[in-house]
Swiss-Prot record:
N-terminal Ras-GEF domain location: 1102-1249
Amino acid composition bias (Polar residues), ranges on this chain: 422-436, 861-876
Gene3D superfamilies: Calponin-like domain, Ras guanine-nucleotide exchange factors catalytic domain, Son of sevenless (SoS) protein Chain: S domain 1
Organism in which the protein naturally occurs: Dictyostelium discoideum
Protein name: Ras guanine nucleotide exchange factor P
Gene: gefP
Keyword Coiled coil found: yes
Ranges where the record places region Disordered: 216-242, 325-436, 456-534, 589-935
Coiled-coil region: 287-328, 451-515, 1032-1076
Comp. bias (Pro residues): 518-528
Function description: Promotes the exchange of Ras-bound GDP by GTP.
Amino acid sequence: MNDSTQILDESGDFSFLSLNENKSRSRSTSTCSINSVEIIDGGSCDSSGDDDKNNSYLDEEKKRILRKTYLYFNANNKKTQLNFIIDNQVLDWIFNQTKTKISKPICESLKNGVALCKIINLIKPNTIKKINLNSSIFSYRENLTNFTKGCESIGMTEDMSRFQELVFEDKESAVLQLLYSLMKFSEKILPNTISTSPPSQLNICKSPVLLKKAAAQSSSSSPTTSTSASTSTSTSPSSSNESIAKPILSALSSSSSTLFSAAPTPTSTNTVPYKFIGHSKSKLFGQQQQQQQQQQQQQQQQQQQQQQQQQQQQQQQQQQQQQQQQQQPPPQTSTCTTTQPTTTTTEEHKLAPPPPLIVPNTSSLPPPQPTTSSIIKKAAPAPLKKPSPANTSSNSLLNHLPPPPSSSSTASSAINTPISTPSTSKSNSFQKPNNNFQKPIQIAHVEPIIEENEIEDNTNNNNNNNNNNNNNNNNNNNNNNNNNNNNNNNNTNDNINNNNKNNNNNQNENEDEVKPVHSPPKVRPPLPSRVGRGQLLRSSSEEIQFDIENASVSEAPSPVMTMNEDYSIVTDANSLTNHYNGANEYTTTTTAATTNLPNESSSRSNSASSNGDQNNNNNNNNNNNNNNNNNNNNNNNNNNNNNNNNLQLPAKINSEPNNQYNTISTSSPSTTGTILESPNGSSIFSQPLNNNNNINNENNNSNNSNSLVTSSSPPLSLPAYSANGSPNCPQGKKQRSGTKLRSFFGVKSKPESKSVSNFYGVGNSINQPPSNSSPKQSPVPNNPPSVSQSFLNLSMNSKSSKKKKDNISPDINSNSNNNNNNNNNNNNNNNNNNNNNNNNNNNNNNNNNNNNNLEEDENPLTMSNQSANSLKSSGNHFEDDITNGNNNISQNQNQNQNQNQNQTQNQNQNQNQNHISHSNSISSGNLNNHVNQNNNVNEESVDSELMKALSKVEFLFKDRKVLKERINFTYPEKYLKFFVNMDELIQIDNSTTFLTESLLSKRPSQQLELCHQEERRFLSEIVTLQNVLNVVEENKNLITRTEEMQKMIDSLMKEKKELINEKNTLASMLAKTKQQQQQQSNDTVSQRKMVDDGIVYNYNHGKYEIKGGTTEKLIELLYNSEFIGSDYFETFLLTYRSFASPKRVMDVLTKTYNENYSVEGNATDDVEKRLELDQFNKQRKDTHLKICNFLKRWVEKHFYDFDQDLLQEFNTFIANCRVINHQDFLQKTLNKKLIPLSSSELKLVFSTPTPAPILPKTPITCFEDMDPAEIARQLTLIEFNLFKNIANKEFLSLSWQKQDKEKRSPNLLKMIYRFNEVSNWVTSTIVKETTNIKKRASYLKRFIKLAEELRKLNNFNGVFVIVSGLHSASVNRLKNTWAEISKQQQKQFEEFVALTSPQSSFASYRLELRQSTGASIPYLGVHLSDLTFVEEGNQDKLENGYTNFSKCRLIAEQIKAIQEFQQEPYNLREVEEMIPFITHKAVPESECFNLSLICEPRESVN
């Protein structure tokens, strides 16, 4: 039969590489879809697709298969993509749980982390105490960090450490994979949670690691198990299930594990093999539901019958065991029986062994892994049941296998039909993990295989494995008798005959006669929470948990430790368990099957397992007891086998959890390299042993003096999983320490223990006594192996491989070697039980097995034999590695097929000649150990060092990667660019790293040197990264502390500000109080003083104002040097006429000026007198200067005061002035006012051009010929000329109301007269049209339009004039005329009336006047009313007779307001033609009223 190996391309489909006996590579004719997995028959794969299409696909896929290194694979592999169905499932689940709509892009919607934190709290309330709802990036990261920690606290075993990074990098596929795992986990722990869609719709691409392990595990397993083994398959896991996953294989991602759905618990291993026939997805639900229900009922009845039969069989076995124990001497192993809650099957009810599943086989390559048949799309999970204390679910890929049909079932068997899964050399069986899916899902179509050729091949493939099952059966029943040893076949005949029949061919057995024996499915306990960062389990809908029954070990769950690497994650289900043999070799068992454990074989660590050792001891004991005809050679062989299979940790291991990782990182396993041990006995991947372990190590070293121990090997460390005897169950994680590198590189080699590493990378190991050996058992000395033979064997194996170019981890082949050592023991059992085998046959069988173990595909590169094969076995991520061991087993089995014992002996002898192996020299006791030793000693030394260097390189690479991830996770914004630059600098992808072709093409010494260079470089980088990480963490702590301190500072600053404000408020209040008191006191003093001096002050609005004073004092303040204020000058000049005449003011100023001339001192005066004189003269000069400035302002601003008499006095003052500068200054000011300016000089210049007048084309003859806008302009010019000529004195003392008003206010009276004239013009123009009402109405409209134009020109006086004319009694009574105008014009006129309304002291007018800009003409009636109010409301004199200067100040304010409008003229042009029509004599009011009566007579009243 051609062995086949699965290969997964990037598209997610399976293809099969068929390998014939000559190791030639040929591609199969079809591919298997990921949704319909099939069993290969004769190297082919059944598929419903077109052959041509498949062939073209295979050709394309052949080009796409990459042979890359482990490092390159981890760095460059693409993440498998979830299909849109899974996307919708996850999004709908999030919406149903949190009522939060997640839209695309998904990462952008999930970036705030609020919905994710809510999901965690829904799964386990109060897990996340605080959810940050802010929109800052810091809040997002805090929520995502809490979500990651929450996943760990609720028991989530997926590696969520990179979730935050994936979200911020918008890697939706990876994020959805992790969320899908969380969804399935929540369904598991929350039974009420309903899955959004059937899991069979899952369409996830499988990784190469997964497919390789699937093929390797099934290929190395045996098709049948013994009766006792079958009874234990559904009950308890073997110790291999709890063993530690190798670091390179413990990284199966959760996305890969979701590819396989859970299968029901197998109740019996005696079932018919079957194969899956692919079909479309549309047929997955609803084709065989009725048949499945019927089949389930039949199976339940069969299970009940089988249980009864098993109980009877168990009773018979117990009786036989008791009889044999009386006849036999005490066994050497501890027989503490483990109680298992399962039923056993009697010999009478045993069934013939079925042919094995036709799956790819492996021999010496990676450890047993799932078969192609095990890779199915989500078989229907069984409902969740209460866990049994003695049952656990093995975390294996084979747990996801759908059940096979019984012989009487139809092609589509029931979902819970058990499957006979191939077991390894330790008779492992598989159990279905827990599942919470309540909805059954149909699986692929199943048919039994009845071809004879397949039965033959499978039977031959698993001859040795049948005996392995016998060993396990001995362990399970703890009896060393013939019945247990020969309980291999499941027939009801004699045990020895069954063994002989099994050793021969089972090809003639009829499959139709084989019926499955069912047992009720067992309950699986839930998986505990993951502790430790970087640990992952598959994200399927059920949890995997190991339950251990041991005398010295308590039950403990076992989460999986994985790397913190993308795309290379292996679950614990696919991990390997390494067992040491007594000859310092490895035995490998999968963690996929479950078996009963003896109570004293509970030691579990990464380096050894006591189960396999105890099995081998039982086999040897049984052989010695049952087969009395065996000679000493046979005993020696058995003892050698015992030594081969009993290298393990002592039985007493600290049951307390110790999760101190020995690597720099805690988020991923440290290495996938060789498992090396330190001289003190503790593996680098395990915990340090206690004192008892050290004692056992010393005893074992004394017994096995020829063990291969290399103390100089670096102790590559991995998380130590031996908590409570259960592997893979860290209870916590320890912060990684850079000082642990010393334990890796600080171990010095001892010359006496120096030796080469074996082919599988076991560079150094500790000889440890088996935990199950009794004190009476004496150690059997081992013959030292021949170094030359071992490397010759390596060379033979290297030449025998034809296709392998990829590289796999050295851990895998070391495990495969261990499996083959177990096969040696099984062959010994076969020969001893049959009583016809002699010592030579026994030795030959062992040699044969060892040869098969060491067979490898040839590496075309020119690397040395041992290192090449070892390095090939170091990578576990590629597909082609699986086929090596399959072909080797196939050769061994084909040679043993259809032969009697003599033929078997001859063929084994021939193989012994062709394949000299290291294990052969140890197990057979061959003394040819020194052949060609001198030729290979240098090569083996280089290869040994090369293996160590490669392990170090890989170890350091992963530590460096983890450090980078931690740094980027801690502070990615700041340090991400730095590490990108660092990667460019070191050029990791372009350098010669671990297992590249450029490395393998060099000589071993060059390879070693390159590895040392990489090691030094990685060490330097790690030191740098460690320093950077420390700095980053310190910076983060400092930032946190800085933020806290900043908050404290802000709060203190806020409090400080509040205190300062309160202080300022109190201080201001106190200051005001003091100031008021001081001012009151000052006012009292000043007022008393000023009263005495003739001046009275008033304090108003924080300043002193002159309230009153005598006329002389008020004039004196004009030149007082101590009094400063220009406002006083203006107020005095505007209002002085109310209390003094201009002549009196001029006389006082002239007198004061003449009295303040400078005084000349004598030359004999002393300095002090001179200074006093100078100060006195300075004051006088200041008085002169102030008088001159006042006179200048008086002449410029109020020249109208200078009549003829006053002008003469002013000229006299100038003539008598002795200060020449002052005389010239005053004379120039007077000349400007006396000399009239020319017209050109008087012309004003405006910034804007003068608008052109609006004139009719024809000469103006009447009022209708003129435009209202131009009429408004001409009226404004006339009124402004009158307004600007009004002098300030005309507004004083109500001059316009006095008898001599014509003299005192001539210009003001002209303005008043003009107002009345225009108003009379408006009235008379309308009422004169007595006959034509239409014409009167048109006049009325034109005057309203004229008022609008005047308002636009800010001529408020004109607006008041028009409104006054139209509102007169003569016009207002003309109702018929007002009725002729439109409502719009009437409304407009009402607005003018409101503007001129005297309501609220003309508030509307005052407001619009303040808001006006440009030239304006105010309505003087309002301002004259204000002056009248001030004059009449205030007295001219104070009580003491002083002038009331406060009244003068109020009058000055009104006059100043009028003066502001006089300063800005209009930019208009005068039109002389229009003057006659807008100026006329006024018509008396009585006459106008009479004309109004003529226009509209009064209505008669009847």
